[in-house]
Amino acid sequence: MEINWSWQRFNDISGEAMHEMLALRQEVFVVEQGCLYLDADGLDKQSWHLFGRTNDQQLVAYARLNFPNTRYPEPSFGRVLTSKAIRGMGAGRKIVAACIQKSLREYPNLDLQISAQAHLTEFYAEFGFTKVGDPYDDHGIEHISMIFRVPPNG
């Protein structure tokens, strides 16, 4: 299945695309994972949004890249998700790679910090992320902070 990727800032997202984004985030994080939290947390306005759509424009993958000094001093990405329809097809790897590339392009001298679900630390380590600190509970799911260090020469 071919997925077409595009980045948008909050103010450039149409009402329909915003609805699709929020619905898919709720489907994955609230319904599937049982995390009861305010998804529209105010960080969307200070973020780049990655949309992954099929050729028929169905939203099947998503992530957001928070601007520096929004969640952490460094840029960070989160809300990484794929719909059930495409899981196991490598889209998660493409999302993480796209987030790293976008961060390096927009913020070339800044490291990238994430709050990773603990069971995904090895997955993120494959991209160069290292654990920082101890695991912690985030809405009933164990997480750990991880950081991607930008090489000294960018």
From Swiss-Prot:
CDD domains: NAT_SF. Belongs to the UPF0039 (ElaA) family. Signal peptide: none annotated. It comes from Synechocystis sp. (strain ATCC 27184 / PCC 6803 / Kazusa). One of its GO terms (molecular function) is acyltransferase activity, transferring groups other than amino-acyl groups. SUPFAM superfamilies: Acyl-CoA N-acyltransferases (Nat). InterPro entries: Acyl_CoA_acyltransferase, GNAT_dom. It comes from the Bacteria. This is UPF0039 protein sll0451. Pfam families: Acetyltransf_10. Residues 8-151 form the N-acetyltransferase domain.
